[in-house]
Amino acid sequence: VSYIRHAKKPYIFVGGGAVISEASEELKEFVELVDAPVTDTLMGKGAYDGTGERYTGMLGMHGTKTSNLGVSECDLLIAIGVRFSDRVIGNAKKFARHAKILQFDVDPAEVNKNIVVDACVMGDVREILKKVNERLEPMEHREWMEHILEYKKQYPLTYHPQGLSGPYMI
């Protein structure tokens, strides 16, 4: 909890462990308490509301520019039920290089496997979040969130169709 309380630019990174653990409600409360942006992996889809303003899209090679820039600038990455796959981290030496990394996970094989973390809390993600939420007071990271929201405006995930796509032409 100390890492979380001292962070000025926290970022929450959600993976499949949060889905398997059915931790959506606890995750929602955690995000509100920490007042931080949220990114996820393909396996983490559904654990957090992908339509909310705090949500920045997926992370990594299949992710958004906002998520990738934000994680590169954060001072604390809170990894919840993630594997740190190569499609997410890219160059391990450059991944979240300005951040402490705090991992919540049930699988000891995932800890320090691809990314060395600063601290890990082992156990069921839902239970971890319940306990952490009980110990946190609401925080405010207004400037950090405004910075991330500016990225979302500057680099929106949009689609602009121009003419017929390949399948329609056939």
What is the role of each PLM region?
Residues 14, 80-81, 124:
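Glycine-rich, N-terminal phosphate-binding loop of Rossmann-like dinucleotide-binding domains
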